[in-house]
Structures are given as C-alpha cells and as structure tokens.
Amino acid sequence: MIRRLPILEGRLQPALILCLILLAVPAAGRPAEVHAPDVKVRLVTDEADMALAILNERAERGEASPQSWERLWKSEGFVRLKKRQEAFGAKDVEKDFRDFLGSAKPLAQRDALRQALELWKHLGVPAAAQRAAAYLPPGIPLRATIYPVIKKSVNSFVFELDTNPAMFVHVDPQKSSDSLENTLVHELHHVGLAGCPKPPDFDRMSAAQKKAFDDLGAFGEGLAVLAAAGGPDVHPHATDTPEAWLVWERDVAGFSVDLRRLEAFFRDILAGRLPAEEENRQLISFIDAEGVPQGPFYTVGWKMAAMVERARGREGLVKTVCDPRTLLAAYNEVAADHPRRAGEGLALWSPDFLAALAPPHPRGG
C-alpha cells in the first residue's frame, strides 16, 4: 500500500454500569512493544478505545458521561494528537472532537470502527518494524509510537520526528490487515530515515545545494515502497486492488521521462530559478498523481532502489539510503549495464547534474 510523504502532511463499548467500562478500556489500550538492537516501536490504541467507548455509550444511553470524555482527553493518543494539531494552528481541538463524536456518521460506523481497531490490535507490529529496519543502515535507530486514531479527518501523519517520533494513523474500516501492515512498514521506514545524519559535506554546500539535497529526500518514498513490499521481486501493490496495480504499472512505464523531469526540477533549484512557493508546488506534483499519493518520487525512487538491490544486494542498497545522491550514482552505474530494448536504454542522471549536487572540495589539507 502506498502512503504519502510524511513531511507533507500533511473514538467503543457502553455499559449499563459505568464501572465495567472503566475496567475494560485500560486493558484494551495497553501498548504493545517490540524491542531489537536499534528498534523500539509501540502501538498505543487508547485514544481509539476511549472514542469507541463514547460511541457505545451514545448508542446505549443517548449520550456519553463526563467521565468518559475526561478519559478521552487524558489518553496518551489524544494528548499527543492535540499537541500536534495545536502546533499546526488548530483551535478548540476538544470541541471539534465533541462535535465529531456527537454526530451521526461515527455512530453509524461504530461496529466497522471496532472491527478496524481490532485489526490494528492484532497487527504484526514486530514484523512490520523489522521489515522497515531491514532497509535502514546499521546504527540508525527506529523509534516510534503508533497511534491508531478515530478522528474526523482521514489523513495520517507523523509528529516530533526529532524528539519523540509519533505516527497517527486514521482508523479506516476499508483497510485489510495486509494493507495496514504495508502502510505501517512504509511509514516506519520514513521515521527511521529521519534519523539519518547529514552527510559530511553538508555544511560546505551552498544554500541551493542544501535545498536540492533536502528535496532529494523525497526519493525516500520509493525506498519505503520497496521496504513495504519486502523486496524488489514483490509487486508494490500485491495487497491492493487490480486497479491500483494497473495505475502503478502505467506510472512505472514512464520512468525515463519522469527521471528527466525530476532532473530538470533539481537543476532549477540549483540555479535558483524557483521561488519557494513554486518549488513546493512542483515538489508536491511529483508525489501526488491526480490526488493519489503516488508519482515520480515513488516510481522512479522505487525502480532505482530495486535495480540497485538486485545488482548489489540489500546491503549495497542500504549504504545509499542516508544520502540520496549516492543512490542516484549507484543507479547510474547499474543502469548503464541494463539490457537495451528497442534500441534505447534506461535514462541516466547527467554526470554534470550529479557533480553539481556536491560542494567544491576544500582547499589545502
């Protein structure tokens, strides 16, 4: 399942006796954890548990008790979600949740939401974390708390990647467990990638080179697609609909054209020809195909990474993930030997473009 670049951002059972809710809900919200040398991922469902409890109380009694609302406000998931929303300028977050959970739509969906949340609770979080970590360099930590949340907006996003990484994932009744796990791997890989150090030459880069380097990080979408699939020989949409499969095949077929379009975009950044607003508009256009989170950063990034892994193994690919410039160079070397078809090989990154991404070597020793 393909997910959107996280940097672009871009609430259960009533009781005839209230104390039964109090006893049941905390157990449901207990976090599941997975630990490994560089992996610590928690799944915390308390916000969704409390939201479902409110919906169930509404169904049983017509309204939820003040105590139930207070438990929602104090849940770890809601506290962090509110902090994130307020960081983006939201006002009256609690009122918005009251209005949403008091409306007809979530009440009508409560059985479907309960089933969707149960899928999350039985999801293979340890396996998903290890699949994401398999495409990260040794020593890069993968730390995250995953919050399946019931909320009005259907988007999912990350927060506080530099300090206490959180993933907020919309509880979607339409998702299968396989699709959810692929989404989880994809987003966890983004979280891990955010822990990469800057390259040694970053401080010597010009402002334009730093912009280009940061935007090259969007190829992390393709890397995350590969990690979620589990390898270069597994179709990225193996768990999706035939329609999604066909759209992916259509877009991958435009690889060479899209590579040249991306190079032109980065050349404009390096030359200082793009105002910030236009740069962002074009960047988004490369990760959003007709409203679908897919585009050249996904397809070109995936194909480059898949070819490098096939030719050099996963270890060879993983060496490139923290510096996307090395991925482009590795792809060029692999693609130069790729079999030709119809008299034309795969498009390559221009040598002068790759050279322009690096700052001059320092003088002297």
Language model segments and positions:
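Acidic/His-rich structured neighborhood in mature extracellular/periplasmic domains
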Residues: 98-248
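Structured segments of extracytoplasmic/periplasmic soluble domains
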Residues: 51-62, 75-76, 135, 191, ...
